[in-house]
Swiss-Prot record:
Keywords: Protein transport, Transport. Residues 215-241 are annotated as: Zinc finger-like. GO terms for biological process: COPII-coated vesicle cargo loading; intracellular protein transport; late endosome to vacuole transport via multivesicular body sorting pathway. InterPro entries: ADF-H/Gelsolin-like_dom_sf, Gelsolin-like_dom, Gelsolin-like_dom_sf, Sec23/24_helical_dom, Sec23/24_helical_dom_sf, Sec23/24_trunk_dom, Sec23_24_beta_S, SEC23_SEC24_subfamily. This is Uncharacterized protein C4.03c. GO terms for molecular function: SNARE binding; zinc ion binding. CDD domains: Sec24-like (cd01479). Belongs to the SEC23/SEC24 family. SEC24 subfamily. It holds the Pfam family Sec23_helical. GO terms for cellular component: COPII vesicle coat; cytosol; endoplasmic reticulum exit site. It comes from the Eukaryota.
């Protein structure tokens, strides 16, 4: 395979484009209904009324903007739909080659009172998706990368794909003064194990187990596409620090023989993202890397059993071990459960039935046996399935209310300390017995006071000390909280946070309703790409230095951060500061290296490379600023610093961040602006609404928010990838009653990256949520299917096969029936396409019926453009920003 890059022939993007187009059908998968589109196209040519005409699937003709008009029912007539403004013309983003050209501005001066005239996040996202629908994003091309919510195909040409790394601006200020003048925070967000589309080229793997990867002798940066050859190509100059290195030092010279053959055959000199397989010099204490071991640790106390958790967990584990996606054949698993004791299962393939042995010592947990504890799930399939079959019955009569969570976490350490690996722990109640026992400290009287932040910090250092031991041993843990009462996520969850794992919090868990979501979350947690025994370090050009890392990890030194495990759905934010001046004649270079062990037991280094232009003008930095990374960096800084301040202080700093950026823009563009206007740079047109969404998030907003919910969201914000964070802040809302005949169906002429025609979303405001409508709401963590109380019975029948909202059980998981209607096919196709685009997200929608379900409050919290008791509406927030700009004197 030829890798396009900096040297010689860059490869043929057209060939790659054709290969991608040829793979679209396979990417769509069997869940996308392609039959309907062909059937509808064929019927267009059949004379109406012909006896030969086939019977089409039932479809409703659109009336006005509605596919299901309320005039067909006896209910009150629906209000006239609020029409969104037309999609604006394509953005003309400035490019690094012409950084002095200012972006076009958005002025809202003419009609401030019209909500439809405000910048629309759905329209900007839709336009960006259409821009990249039929073209490949080449990483060395000029222009801005696709938005995180855009489904696109990336083609690496030296720089890593924006799926792996994004910068707040692609014009790096040469000095600290220029950076401050721009108002743009200088940072990047790296997602080293980001998942690629099946039709994208996988990350190349270079085998250096016998000879180490070539590295700079001075800064220890890894060889990459941006090095320069010197001295008749026998030496190379490091693009990070400028030092000269010899190829012979590493037994590596790509230019032996012809230059074309040598460089083109080396992926590390052509693509931005690379994996190096490394040898014993990269081992930990000369300990050979071992295949991962997975531990499923299940709470079976009374609270868990009464909620049906053992049954849900057993079904989820069965699907993981014997479902459609096989585990790495080298991985071994153990199943352990706990109530007041820790119960171990011997799953040896030589047994006919699993053997259980309980260890009830609360002060000194131990592992009572080793043989048969970790097993090959295929070799032990019979005995494992017998355990899973009987698992719910074994503990159905358990009446023990206190789970020894601390003992269970200590046992995880004992099980994995020699090999490293990953644990998946289910917790249903506050641990009040055994190691790490905690007290109930939730106190609503603290809400809104200076002492509320105490609820967000750990109450017992035992858990943070355990997390330190986890990281040392290469252990990561994901914790699934299914409690219906206070469980102290801040303390218990710190083990997951510091080890690089994840917190899953299911507030008011109901097995029938939330079980499908939990199963999908656990499946993703186990099967996504991940590594363990992880260390990460970012290097950058002379003149810059790393000032801070943000995320969920353990940091023992200023230079490196460590994880017990790191997976595809985690990001790390890197903030930079100046220790000198960048050379404006050269690019700024950045490299993140991640040392890790794969689940199969290979020691590797994943390297992510990127270069940006350097500028001495602040308006270049503003012109090439990208709104999503800016918002993400500001949100992650806020979620990290909030424990040292207050909710009010955090909100003030976020608003000040927006004002600083916009006031900087007014300074550099003063000669092009009309005094008194509120003007937004077009590339930052979504900055106010996204920051408003941060202010209204359950992580940051004031009000009576349970500390478990707030803490889980704060820690989610710190480590969430940009894509997930953006959808958490501003969801995609699909009006199902307005789907057009071609929406959510395959386009026979579509040669791009989308398997179906995606509809335009509606804005997150009650003004755009129509009476009688049905809406699919997709956030970064959860999805909802919301029905207005006057939803058409015809829609309910075509989508769910029911006659009324009362026929729907909202406490059970939604399973869309396969109906012979156009709407059924459209919605099932839509969900299938979204699951492929957002594999980390739980897309088993929770049904919410207006006026009938208590969870309706969750729906309203997603409508971030509206006024609430705790925050401004969109228009009022823009007014506040405008006033702040005038207060500072920028008129």
């Amino acid at each position: 395979m030829a890798y396009p890059g900096q040297f010689g022939n860059y490869g043929n993007p057209e060939t790659y484009r054709q290969n991608v187009a040829g793979n679209i059908a396979s990417y769509g998968g069997p869940e996308i209904d392609t039959q309907l589109a062909a059937q509808m196209n064929a019927q267009m040519y059949i004379q109406q009324g012909s006896a030969m005409a086939p019977q089409p699937r039932r479809a409703r003709r659109h009336k006005d903007a509605h596919a299901y008009d309320m005039s067909l029912t006896d209910a009150e007539p629906a209000l006239a739909p609020v029409m969104s403004p037309a999609i604006p013309p394509s953005m003309n983003y400035p490019t690094p080659s012409t950084p002095s050209v200012l972006p076009e501005s958005f002025s809202n001066d003419t009609n401030l009172l019209d909500p439809a005239a405000l910048p629309s996040a759905p329209e900007v996202r839709y336009e960006d998706q259409q821009l990249f629908k039929n073209q490949i994003f080449n990483t060395m091309e000029k222009g801005s990368p696709p938005m995180s919510t855009t489904d696109f195909v990336g083609y690496e040409q030296g720089n890593s794909s924006s799926k792996f790394v994004q910068f707040t601006s692609y014009a790096i200020p040469a000095t600290n003064d220029v950076c401050n003048a721009s108002g743009i925070p200088l940072g990047m967000i790296v997602q080293p194990f980001a998942e690629l589309r099946p039709d994208e080229a996988p990350v190349p793997v270079v085998d250096n187990t016998n000879s180490n990867p070539p590295r700079c002798k001075k800064c220890r940066g890894y060889i990459n596409p941006f090095i320069q050859f010197t001295m008749a190509s026998s030496k190379w100059t490091c693009n990070l620090c400028g030092s000269e290195n010899s190829f012979n030092d590493d037994g590596f010279n790509p230019l032996v023989g012809s230059q074309h053959d040598g460089v083109e055959s080396r992926p590390e000199l052509n693509v931005g993202t690379i994996d190096f397989k490394v040898g014993k010099d990269y081992w930990i204490k000369e300990d050979p890397p071992k295949p991962a071991r997975f531990v499923f640790m299940i709470d079976v106390s009374y609270e868990a059993s009464s909620k049906g958790l053992p049954k849900v967990a057993a079904e989820a584990i069965r699907n993981i071990l014997y479902g459609p996606v096989p585990l790495d054949p080298n991985v071994k698993i153990a199943i352990v459960c706990f109530d007041r004791s820790v119960n171990f299962f011997n799953l040896s393939p030589n047994l006919e039935q699993p053997h259980m042995l309980a260890a009830s010592d609360l002060e000194n947990p131990f592992v009572p046996f080793s043989s048969g504890l970790f097993v090959d799930p295929i070799a032990s399939k019979v005995v494992i399935e017998r355990l899973l079959d009987s698992f719910p019955a074994i503990f159905q009569d358990v009446k023990i209310p206190e789970p020894v969570v601390g003992n269970a976490l200590e046992v995880v350490k004992l099980l994995l300390k020699e090999t490293g690996g990953k644990a998946f722990v289910f917790v249903s109640a506050l641990p009040t017995m055994g190691l790490g026992k905690l007290r109930h400290r939730e106190d609503q009287r603290l809400y809104g006071t200076s002492d509320e932040k105490n609820l967000w910090n750990t109450q017992d250092k035992w858990y943070t000390s355990l997390a330190d031991e986890y990281v040392t041993a290469g252990i990561g843990v994901d914790i699934f909280f299914t409690a219906t009462a206070y469980v102290d996520v801040a303390t218990v969850g710190s083990v997951a946070t510091l080890s690089g794992g994840q917190i899953y919090h299911y507030s008011n868990f109901v097995a029938d309703r939330d079980g499908s979501r939990l199963k999908q979350d656990l499946f993703r947690s186990v099967t996504r790409e991940q590594g363990y025994r992880v260390m990460l370090k970012t290097r950058c050009s002379n003149g810059l230095r790393v000032s801070k890392y943000l995320g969920n990890f353990l940091q023992r030194t200023p230079q490196d951060i460590e994880f017990g495990s790191l997976d595809a759905d985690k990001s790390v934010t890197v903030l930079f500061s100046y220790d000198g001046k960048l050379n404006g004649a050269l690019d700024a270079h950045f490299q993140t290296a991640v040392l890790y062990t794969t689940p199969s037991g290979e020691r590797r280094v994943r390297v992510v490379n990127y270069c940006c232009a350097v500028t001495s003008k602040s308006y270049d930095t503003i012109s090439l600023a990208i709104v999503e990374p800016i918002v993400a960096v500001l949100a992650k800084i806020a979620s990290t610093n909030i424990a040292a301040g207050s909710l009010k202080d955090t909100s003030v700093r976020l608003v000040e961040g927006v004002v600083k950026i916009l006031s900087s823009y007014r300074k550099v563009a003063a000669n092009r602006l009309t005094p008194g206007q509120l003007v937004l740079p077009k590339n930052l047109v979504l900055l106010p609404i996204l920051i408003l969404a941060v202010l209204k998030s359950s992580a940051i907003r004031s009000g009576s928010i349970h500390s478990d919910i707030r803490v889980s969201q704060l820690r989610e914000v710190r480590a969430a990838p940009i894509q997930e964070l953006m959808l958490n802040l501003y969801p995609n809302i699909y009006a199902l009653h307005q789907l057009q005949p071609t929406d959510c169906l395959p386009d026979p002429e579509n040669t791009g990256c989308l398997p179906i025609n995606m509809p335009l979303c509606v804005r997150a405001s009650r003004k755009f949520i129509e009476d009688g409508g049905a809406f699919l709401i997709v956030t970064g963590q959860k999805s909802y299917l919301w029905f207005h109380q006057r939803t058409s019975p015809l829609l309910l029948q075509d989508l769910l096969g029911v006659e009324s909202l009362e026929d729907i059980d909202s406490l059970k998981a939604l399973e869309l029936p396969t109906l012979d209607t156009v709407l059924s096919v459209q919605v099932r196709n839509l969900l299938s396409s979204l699951r492929m685009q957002f594999p980390s997200m739980a897309l088993h929608p929770q049904i919410v019926r207006q006026g009938l379900d208590g969870s309706e409050g969750e729906i309203f919290s997603t409508l971030v453009e509206d006024n609430t008791r705790e925050g401004f509406g969109y228009l009022d927030f823009l007014t506040k920003i405008h006033e702040s700009l005038h207060t500072q004197g920028y008129k």
